[in-house]
UniProtKB/Swiss-Prot annotation:
<dbReference type="Pfam" id="PF01266">
    <property type="entry name" value="DAO"/>
</dbReference>
<dbReference type="GO" id="GO:0005737">
    <property type="term" value="C:cytoplasm"/>
</dbReference>
<keyword id="KW-0274">FAD</keyword>
<keyword id="KW-0285">Flavoprotein</keyword>
<dbReference type="InterPro" id="IPR036188">
    <property type="entry name" value="FAD/NAD-bd_sf"/>
</dbReference>
<keyword id="KW-0560">Oxidoreductase</keyword>
<dbReference type="InterPro" id="IPR006076">
    <property type="entry name" value="FAD-dep_OxRdtase"/>
</dbReference>
<dbReference type="InterPro" id="IPR023080">
    <property type="entry name" value="DadA"/>
</dbReference>
<feature type="binding site">
    <location>
        <begin position="3"/>
        <end position="17"/>
    </location>
    <ligand>
        <name>FAD</name>
    </ligand>
</feature>
<dbReference type="GO" id="GO:0005886">
    <property type="term" value="C:plasma membrane"/>
</dbReference>
<dbReference type="GO" id="GO:0008718">
    <property type="term" value="F:D-amino-acid dehydrogenase activity"/>
</dbReference>
<comment type="similarity">
    <text>Belongs to the DadA oxidoreductase family.</text>
</comment>
<dbReference type="GO" id="GO:0055130">
    <property type="term" value="P:D-alanine catabolic process"/>
</dbReference>
<comment type="function">
    <text>Oxidative deamination of D-amino acids.</text>
</comment>
<protein>
    <recommendedName>
        <fullName>D-amino acid dehydrogenase</fullName>
        <ecNumber>1.4.99.-</ecNumber>
    </recommendedName>
</protein>
<comment type="pathway">
    <text>Amino-acid degradation; D-alanine degradation; NH(3) and pyruvate from D-alanine: step 1/1.</text>
</comment>
C-alpha cells in the first residue's frame, strides 16, 4: 500500500519507519524544512516508561486552584478561555477520579512498556546515536505528603510489572550524587531503573536517514491544506505543493491534528499544552544530574545529555502561543539553580517552547477512524518521546490489518465518539 504520513516529529517518523518495515511505500509530509523541528526539537529528553501518568488524577482540581496563585507553579492558564479549552478541561476533570486514573495509567503504562521493547530493539539493530543513556529516572520529593501520595502509583507500577524502588535521601544520592549539597531539601525519591534519556531531535534526524534507506520519501516545506474526502474515505490531500494521493493516510501532526481532522467532521479532544525548556552546557560534571531528576514539587525534569543539561517543565494552557515570557524562564531557572546550582553555564542558556498534544485522559489516540482509510497517531502529551516507538509499531499494525503486539483497541478515537 501507499501511505502518506502527515508530520515528521518523533511520532510521525516512527510511524513511517514501522510502516516501511511492513513493506508499505511511505511518504512523509511536513511543513518544516527537516524532521523533528517542532515539539520534538528540545523536549525534556526523558524517556520515562515508569513515569507515564495521566495529568487527570484525584486531587488535581484542588491542586490546580492553588497552582494558579503561585509564582513558580507547574500549571498556568491564560485568562481568555476558548470554547476548545473549556470543552477539553471539562473532559479532563471527568477523569480526575480513582477508577479512571487507574484505567488511564494502566493503558499508558502498557504503551510505554511496549515502547521500551521497541526502542531497545531499534537502537540495537540500527545502531542509532542520539546521546542515549539507560540510567533511570529519580523522582525527588520535598515533603512527606508527596511520599505518602506516591503509594498509589507504586501499586499501579507493580501491577504493570515496572521495576521501581522507594528511596530514602542517602539512596537518592547513590544514583544522583550531584544532589549531595542540597540533600536537606529532600525527603526521598522514587527510582525507576529502566527509564532512559536521549536527545529526541537527534533521534529524529538519525531515523530520517535510516528511513530514507528503506525507501521512505520526505516532502519538507510543505503544509497540508485540506483532506479531500468522499464516501467516508480520503481521496487526496491538497498541500502548498499540490495534491498527493495514497491508499491510506496517517495524521501525526501533534496539536495541529485537531484542526486537520475537523475537515472530515472528526472532533478529537487534543489541546496544545505549552511547555518550556532550557539547555545548558555542563561546567561541573560532578555537580550535574547523571540521568533524569524529576522535581515532583515543580513538575520540572532535569536531564543529562553528553555535555549538556536539558531542564523542562510547566504546563501552560494558552492555545497556539509560542512566546516565552520571562516569568516562565524564571521557574525553570529556579529549579535547576535550587537542586544543581553549580552544574551549568547560564551565560550560554538556550530557551525553547513547544506545544504538547494532550488528551483529557492522558492516553494517545492511535488507530482507525470512522474514515475508512484515515488513521491517527497523536495526543501523547508530554510522553511522545517515551511512547514513540511503541506507538509507531502499533499504528503500522493497525494500518496493515495485522494483529498488534499488545492490546490496542482502546487507544483509538472511538473512545471519544
Amino acid at each position: 500500500m501507499e501511505v502518506i504520513v502527515i508530520g515528521s516529529g518523533v511520532i510521525g517518523l516512527t510511524s513511517a519507519w514501522y510502516l516501511a518495515k511492513e513493506g508499505h511505500t511511505v511518504t512523509v509530509i511536513d511543513r518544516q524544512d527537516s524532521s523533528g523541528k517542532e515539539t520534538s526539537f528540545a523536549n525534556a529528553g526523558q524517556i520515562s516508561y515508569g513515569y507515564s501518568s495521566p495529568w487527570a488524577a484525584p486531587g488535581i482540581p484542588l491542586k490546580a486552584m492553588k497552582w494558579l496563585t503561585q509564582e513558580h507553579a507547574p500549571l498556568k492558564v491564560k485568562p481568555s478561555l476558548s470554547p476548545e479549552l473549556v470543552a477539553w478541561a471539562t473532559k479532563m476533570l471527568a477523569n480526575c477520579n480513582e477508577a479512571k486514573y487507574a484505567m488511564n495509567k494502566s493503558r499508558m503504562l502498557r504503551v510505554a512498556n511496549f515502547s521500551r521493547e521497541c526502542l531497545t530493539h531499534l537502537r540495537t539493530s540500527e545502531d542509532l546515536a542520539y546521546e542515549g543513556r539507560q540510567k533511570g529516572t529519580l523522582q525527588v520529593f520535598r515533603s512527606e505528603k508527596q511520599l505518602d501520595a506516591i503509594q498509589q502509583d507504586m501499586k499501579l507500577l507493580t501491577e504493570s510489572g515496572i521495576e521501581h524502588s522507594l528511596f530514602d535521601v542517602d539512596q537518592c544520592l547513590s544514583v544522583e550524587s550531584g544532589l549531595a549539597d542540597v540533600k536537606d531539601k529532600l525527603v526521598g525519591g522514587l527510582y525507576l531503573p529502566h527509564d532512559e534519556t536521549g536527545d529526541c531531535h537527534q533521534f529524529c534526524l538519525t531515523l530520517t536517514e535510516k528511513a530514507k534507506q528503506l525507501g521512505v520519501r520526505f516532502v519538507f516545506d510543505t503544509e497540508v491544506v485540506s483532506l479531500n474526502h468522499q464516501n467516508r474515505a480520503i481521496e487526496t490531500i491538497t498541500t502548498t505543493q499540490g495534491e498527493f494521493k495514497a491508499d491510506a493516510y496517517v495524521v501525526a501532526s501533534g496539536s495541529y491534528s485537531r484542526e486537520l481532522l475537523k475537515q472530515v467532521d472528526l472532533s478529537i479532544p487534543v489541546y496544545p499544552v505549552k511547555g518550556y525548556s532550557l539547555t545548558l552546557p555542563i561546567v561541573n560534571v560532578d555537580k550535574s544530574p547523571t540521568s533524569t531528576v524529576m522535581d515532583e514539587t515543580y513538575k520540572v525534569a532535569m536531564t543529562r545529555f553528553d555535555d549538556r543539561i536539558r531542564i523542562a517543565g510547566t504546563a501552560e494552557l494558552a492555545g497556539f502561543d509560542y512566546l516565552i515570557p520571562e516569568k516562565r524562564k524564571a521557574t525553570i531557572d529556579m529549579v535547576i539553580k535550587d537542586l544543581f546550582p553549580q552544574a551549568g553555564d547560564f551565560s550560554k542558556a538556550e530557551y525553547w517552547t513547544g506545544l504538547r498534544p494532550m488528551t483529557p485522559d492522558g492516553t494517545p489516540i492511535i488507530g482507525k477512524t470512522p474514515i475508512k482509510n484515515l488513521f491517527t497517531n497523536t495526543g501523547h502529551g508530554t510522553l511522545g518521546w517515551t511512547m514513540a516507538c511503541g506507538s509507531g509499531k502499533i499504528l503500522a499494525s493497525v494500518v496493515s490489518g495485522s494483529a498488534s503486539d499488545i492490546k490496542s483497541d482502546d487507544l483509538s478515537i472511538h473512545r471519544y465518539l
